[in-house]
């Protein structure tokens, strides 16, 4: 989120919270008497804390370092379009001398469906 979007969101939140405080607990037209009796008054601590916490979280979100474009770019690691030079080389049974030769002698071709 860039600074312009965050500023616009902040402005909208401030306008919405100001309108809700100006209207009071009953809304624009006074609301129902049932709700007015249940909610005998506004909760000033909770109402004052909510916009403040929203502003604080928005400011912290703006100050957080974003992920670098290099993190978002994750090329296909295997197959075509790889950046390594090893992709052009072919593996051979003798290429890995670290592996013992009995391993390659045990590897037999599989014959599926033929008897």
From Swiss-Prot:
Signal sequence coordinates: 1-22
Coiled-coil parts of chain: none
Listed GO CC annotations: axon terminus; dendrite; extracellular space; perikaryon; postsynapse
GO MF term (any one): G protein-coupled receptor binding
Propeptide: 23-66, 81-94
Reported function: Morphine modulating peptides. Have wide-ranging physiologic effects, including the modulation of morphine-induced analgesia, elevation of arterial blood pressure, and increased somatostatin secretion from the pancreas. The neuropeptide FF potentiates and sensitizes ASIC3 cation channel.
Protein name, UniProt field: Pro-FMRFamide-related neuropeptide FF
Biological source species: Bos taurus (Bovine)
Gene giving rise to this polypeptide: NPFF
């Amino acid at each position: 989120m860039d600074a312009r979007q965050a500023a616009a969101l902040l402005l909208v939140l401030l306008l919405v919270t100001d309108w809700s405080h100006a209207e009071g607990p009953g809304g624009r037209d006074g609301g129902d008497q049932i709700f007015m009796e249940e909610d005998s008054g506004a909760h000033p601590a909770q109402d004052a804390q909510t916009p403040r916490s929203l502003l604080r979280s928005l400011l912290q979100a703006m100050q957080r370092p974003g992920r670098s474009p290099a993190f978002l770019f994750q090329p296909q690691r295997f197959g075509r379009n790889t950046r390594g030079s090893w992709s052009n080389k072919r593996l051979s049974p003798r290429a890995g001398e670290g592996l013992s030769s009995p391993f390659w002698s045990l590897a037999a071709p599989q014959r599926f469906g033929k008897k």
